[in-house]
Amino acid sequence: MKKNYEISEYGVIRSKEDYDIESSFKSLKELYLPKELFNDLFEFIMQNQEEKKEGERMFSIFSRGKKRQIKTKNYVGVIETSKGLTLEILPKIFFDYSDEDYNTELLDTKKVFLKMLSKLKNSPFLNISSAHLKTSSSFPLLEVFIENYIKDIKKIIRCGLKSQYVDKQENLNFLKGKVVNSLNIKHNHSNKAKFYCAFDEFSDNMVYNQLIKSTLLKLNRISKSHYNRTSILQLLHHFDPVKESSDFISDFRKVGGNNRLFLNYKQAISWSEVFLMNKSFTNFSGNSKNMAILFPMERIFEDYIGYLCKKYAEGREIKTQDKSYYLVEKRILSGTPKEVPKFRLKPDVVSRETDSTLVIDTKWKLLTNSPKGNYGISQSDMYQLYAYGKKYTVKDKSPALILLYPKNKDFTTPLDDFIYDGDLVLGVMPFDLKTSLNKLEEEKEINKVLKASSKTSIYNFQLQPLNMAAEDKTEYIDR
């Protein structure tokens, strides 16, 4: 029996067999799986992480005595294993809910996550409409993704399946194209009435449609939704003359690029890569029996804030991943200074008005309320923002600098400003993601950032040497 389970980032997954836990227990911070499902997930993770360095691993594996445990990191999405486990890993969103409000918290977390995911650049999730978000957040994430793929294929079919010339070789009773001499001799040496020919044929049995058919067949096997499976079977009738793809890697290479004749296939092919190749933004991959669609929340948060800044720009010029400056402009080559820019700077958001510049860098990390540990702010991030401040200074006027983090229970209001030197000031602000559930609140929240100005209070921030262990402890703290 297939079952859907949910856990949040930095949540801990354990085997039920190792703990005396009530069957009714529900929490996004902890998950207790039946032994068979836990072992299946554990083996899947171990296979993917065996040769990876600690910093590249998407899960932490540890033990308490003989009890194995799995801890999620800052990657979200869906994993499906061979034993029927569907695991949704959701972002850690700050809500004021009690433990009894599990279902409400789960629903609202998925609403926020799907909205953020729908703004992820260069991804198929861009077609998740706001109207669809309202109705789909109560469904399993995988089924939401499948339903969106189905919608894309229906659009293609309404316009008619595309055809293109494909290379064919057949033994015919008439001459068509050109004779393949070696094959003609092999097959027709005693039958001069036939010709083994190579020719081009205009057919819908071509690579785009083959990839879509392969995807539909896979989704029909893994979907748990009667509605989705019924829709898939209806769509497959339109692909009866089409064969399955025999080489996914080769076929996806063939459909790469921007072929204007197949623009209406672009979104569907992106989804096909997600489902057939587990192509998200990670190197955590499945196989024929397992599937993993995982995304780094750092990237999702960055793109979502960039989207909001553009949406509520109000006359500001907004650039995301701005590439105007390099850290190094010149080098001494053969004793002569030459323009050889190196180390391009790419702040997440640059907002410009007539006489002011605002540089925003987003960080998906849980800050603390402890000045002793620098609140969990990375020293390298402080250096990075200092470099932005120096490079984006225009006519001796420094830009406003903002480090933006998700709001959490220990970080609910902006920290006192950090003074680098002169008028170069850094603000560290929380962003309340639950405001995305209400358009007016969302606009107010992003405008707090866009209209941020230096406060009058001065906080003497002193950089202390930080070791990675201390930073990791802050980032992975259970909330």
Predicted regions and their residues:
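Residue(s) in the substrate-gating loop at a strand-loop-helix junction
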Residues: 2-285, 290-291
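Catalytic core segments in nucleotide and nucleic-acid processing enzymes
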Residues: 1-49, 288-479
